[in-house]
């Protein structure tokens, strides 16, 4: 859910990948 919110705010795939990597570094 957080990733979706961040994606909506950022609106950038690059930032989404970065956030996803930070939230889910697995």
Curated annotation (Swiss-Prot):
GO BP annotation list: L-methionine salvage from methylthioadenosine
Entry keyword annotation includes Zinc: no
Cystine connections: none
Keywords: Amino-acid biosynthesis, Hydrolase, Magnesium, Metal-binding, Methionine biosynthesis
Cofactor(s) listed in the protein's UniProt record: Mg(2+)
Subunit composition and interactions: Monomer.
Family: Belongs to the HAD-like hydrolase superfamily. MasA/MtnC family.
Protein name: Enolase-phosphatase E1
Species annotation: Klebsiella aerogenes (Enterobacter aerogenes)
């Amino acid at each position: 859910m957080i990733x979706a919110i961040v994606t909506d705010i950022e609106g950038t795939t690059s930032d989404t990948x970065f956030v996803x990597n930070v939230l889910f570094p697995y």
